Regions:
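Metallo-beta-lactamase
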Residues: 17-106
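Generic leucine side-chain signal with a strong bias for well-ordered alpha-helical environments
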Residues: 5, 67-70, 111, 146
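Hydrophobic residues embedded in beta-strands of well-ordered beta-sheets
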Residues: 16, 37-39, 155, 162-163
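Single conserved hydrophobic/aromatic residue that forms the stacking wall/gate
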Residues: 1-12
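C-terminal regulatory/interaction regions
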Residues: 109-167
């Protein structure tokens, strides 16, 4: 917890605004403390990293929408549930959105190149820039990206293999 929050006593009623931010989990909330213009982001946003979106409870479409929703609020900092305090909140939010969309495009391009492929082969191809020890966790995010691409009608799953619909 950042020094701005340590030792502070607050009456929660009417001072903290809950913001439903599904994506990491369906029941995830961020909390906005208007008085100090700080967003308590829980597991929604972290400094220097992205959070895991693990289906079935996590959903990439909802996650990206929730990130965009935060642009409608006014705050100067983010206190994440893990990691460092964030003093450039809207830059980090935009970076996170772009990172997710770029990863999604990488998934789609690999599918277009590889054709119908199982998730494990796709995982190695898409997350070739990730420490191999992290691949089991990356697989959850890959699955979330694939579900989003299916929801967006860009990919189909047939007989255990994913295929681009935009070949």
């Amino acid at each position: 917890i950042h020094h701005r929050l340590v030792g502070s006593e607050m009456c929660i009623r009417d001072r903290i605004k809950p913001i439903h931010t599904p994506g990491h989990a369906s029941n995830h909330y961020c909390f906005l403390i208007d008085e100090i213009k700080c967003l308590l982001s829980g597991d929604h946003i972290m400094d220097g990293s992205t959070v895991v979106i693990a289906p079935k409870d996590g959903n990439m479409n909802e996650y990206i929408s929730s990130l965009k929703k935060l642009n409608d609020f006014s705050f100067d900092s983010i206190a994440p549930g893990h990691g460092n305090f964030i003093d450039n909140p809207f830059e980090i939010i935009e970076w996170t959105i772009q990172h997710r969309l770029e990863r999604e495009e990488k998934v789609h391009k690999k599918l277009s190149k590889l054709g119908a492929v199982g998730i494990n082969r796709l995982l190695i191809s898409v997350y070739n820039d990730v420490n191999p020890k992290l691949l089991p966790i990356a697989k959850w995010s890959l699955e979330a990206h694939l579900i989003k691409l299916i929801e967006d009608e860009r990919v189909v799953l047939e007989k255990g293999k994913y295929r681009s619909l935009e070949d």
